[in-house]
Amino acid sequence: MSFFDHLQKKGVGAIQAQKVQIRKVERKPSKVVSSSSSSSIAKPQRRLDTVSKPVAARRSASSASKPARHPQPRSRPPSRKRNTIEPTLFGSSEESDTDVSLDLRITKRARVSSSVEPDLHRRVRDTDAFSDGEAAFDMIHAADIISSKKSLGFNNAFGIEDGPIIVELQYPGAPQKERYQLVVPRDNDGFKPLDDIVQVLEIVSQNYISEEHLALFEDESNGLLRRLRRALSNTSLTDFLDGVKSYNETIQRLHQDGSISRHLDSKHALALPLVERILTQVYSRTVSPRVDSLRQYENGSDNVYGELLPRLVSKIFAETRLKSDQVFVDLGSGVGNVVLQAALEIGCESWGCEMMQNACDLAELQEKEFKTRCRLWGLQPGQTHLKRGDFLEVDSVGKILQKADVVLINNQAFTPELNHKLVNYFLDMKEGCQIVSLKSFVPAGHRIQSRNLNSPINLLSVKQKQYWSDSVSWTNAAGTYFIATKDSSRLKAFLESST
């Protein structure tokens, strides 16, 4: 969903300090990263804990081709088709629909860090996910996505004719595994199970494995990553299954001996690629299969769909210094992407309100799967609250705005009337509350004067910020956003100087 890994095509590059400058907007192809993992293997009708009869994958004679959203209830510009955060590892061509090809470059792990300031009060690990008594829970498996589409548009990976093969993938948190079908989409924009497996292993290596065990994953001769890359390069199903089995056993051992728990307990923040991977998994299992329902919007109204992509959202969190003991509110939360990102990346109490019913339905699906995914990854997010209705009329929203520390309003296409009504809500917000918007609520050149003393905008101190290209869903271009802080000191100073 880059919704939210640094491999997504939109909105996930490394966050850079923004300078006031003219920058040529260029579109760059997403980087190709290869890594993979999986678990117990089974035939279509049953799963096996071990591979009793290795299946030799046939190599094709032909060459293979190389391989979060944030809707807003009120007005949003029409969005471009959302790009999922899946790296382009596998694909199909007219010449070969079943073979697999990928970039096998070996890269040393770059230690990833959070884009926000460390919050020493935050504890990122979900202790329940690591308890022995963790019960089974409902989840949407990757295999369910394929099944829901009745396998249309997919070919079996590795050239297998009698399949598809099903594998199970172990996560670093709760012991429950996820089922995957080893298939390749005919449409390059379709769901890519192999890519998802690869990214899980890559993210686990980067964020859950301590230095003392790193060689198990990244040894250039026989590390788990290398073994899987070699298996994919050689189109060897047997080697791939063996590599996945070894990965699952390694994760289970590190989970049981406490290594993963200790590593997570040393952290006070989550890296953006990890956040994006989880949000992408949630989005691809809930929103993507139903995304057509979001295309219903009315131009010129307050109900237009559009998203702020994870990179920009993370930058906003950093700019506002949002912390885990604070309250975040998204007015016009769409399918809940930003609400979930705040709860996961920051760990804060996170609220959203949306009036478009289709978006609300999908937001509730995302929220449920989000909690499941956090358990699988062993992470403790902040509380999430999603409300239906007009945020100007929902009582609970008005009350939470009085406690809010950061409020996001994607008012890019709001009508002037709605923007004017919103300004009056700022009167009830607490001192120091920060309001982030794509259009400023304070006109350029505004000055406090005797004739406008009663205007709510006199309570706002505004800063203009820049975002780079591919930060929002409706355009590739760079742009600006605004952070308004409720600060009554300027108005008090004016009144004192006038007496």
From Swiss-Prot:
<feature type="binding site">
    <location>
        <begin position="305"/>
        <end position="308"/>
    </location>
    <ligand>
        <name>S-adenosyl-L-methionine</name>
    </ligand>
</feature>
<feature type="compositionally biased region" description="Basic residues">
    <location>
        <begin position="67"/>
        <end position="82"/>
    </location>
</feature>
<dbReference type="InterPro" id="IPR029063">
    <property type="entry name" value="SAM-dependent_MTases_sf"/>
</dbReference>
<dbReference type="GO" id="GO:0000781">
    <property type="term" value="C:chromosome, telomeric region"/>
</dbReference>
<feature type="binding site">
    <location>
        <position position="354"/>
    </location>
    <ligand>
        <name>S-adenosyl-L-methionine</name>
    </ligand>
</feature>
<dbReference type="GO" id="GO:0140956">
    <property type="term" value="F:histone H3K79 trimethyltransferase activity"/>
</dbReference>
<keyword id="KW-0808">Transferase</keyword>
<feature type="compositionally biased region" description="Low complexity">
    <location>
        <begin position="51"/>
        <end position="66"/>
    </location>
</feature>
<feature type="region of interest" description="Disordered">
    <location>
        <begin position="1"/>
        <end position="96"/>
    </location>
</feature>
<dbReference type="GO" id="GO:0006281">
    <property type="term" value="P:DNA repair"/>
</dbReference>
<keyword id="KW-0804">Transcription</keyword>
<comment type="similarity">
    <text>Belongs to the class I-like SAM-binding methyltransferase superfamily. DOT1 family.</text>
</comment>
<dbReference type="GO" id="GO:0005634">
    <property type="term" value="C:nucleus"/>
</dbReference>
<keyword id="KW-0677">Repeat</keyword>
<keyword id="KW-0949">S-adenosyl-L-methionine</keyword>
<protein>
    <recommendedName>
        <fullName>Histone-lysine N-methyltransferase, H3 lysine-79 specific</fullName>
        <ecNumber>2.1.1.360</ecNumber>
    </recommendedName>
</protein>
<feature type="binding site">
    <location>
        <begin position="328"/>
        <end position="337"/>
    </location>
    <ligand>
        <name>S-adenosyl-L-methionine</name>
    </ligand>
</feature>
<comment type="function">
    <text>Histone methyltransferase that specifically trimethylates histone H3 to form H3K79me3. This methylation is required for telomere silencing and for the pachytene checkpoint during the meiotic cell cycle by allowing the recruitment of RAD9 to double strand breaks. Nucleosomes are preferred as substrate compared to free histone.</text>
</comment>
<dbReference type="Pfam" id="PF08123">
    <property type="entry name" value="DOT1"/>
</dbReference>
<keyword id="KW-0539">Nucleus</keyword>
<dbReference type="InterPro" id="IPR030445">
    <property type="entry name" value="H3-K79_meTrfase"/>
</dbReference>
<keyword id="KW-0489">Methyltransferase</keyword>
<dbReference type="GO" id="GO:0042393">
    <property type="term" value="F:histone binding"/>
</dbReference>
<keyword id="KW-0156">Chromatin regulator</keyword>
<dbReference type="GO" id="GO:0031509">
    <property type="term" value="P:subtelomeric heterochromatin formation"/>
</dbReference>
<dbReference type="GO" id="GO:0000786">
    <property type="term" value="C:nucleosome"/>
</dbReference>
<dbReference type="GO" id="GO:0032259">
    <property type="term" value="P:methylation"/>
</dbReference>
<keyword id="KW-0805">Transcription regulation</keyword>
<dbReference type="InterPro" id="IPR025789">
    <property type="entry name" value="DOT1_dom"/>
</dbReference>
<feature type="binding site">
    <location>
        <begin position="390"/>
        <end position="391"/>
    </location>
    <ligand>
        <name>S-adenosyl-L-methionine</name>
    </ligand>
</feature>
<dbReference type="InterPro" id="IPR021162">
    <property type="entry name" value="Dot1"/>
</dbReference>
<dbReference type="GO" id="GO:0000077">
    <property type="term" value="P:DNA damage checkpoint signaling"/>
</dbReference>
<feature type="domain" description="DOT1">
    <location>
        <begin position="178"/>
        <end position="499"/>
    </location>
</feature>
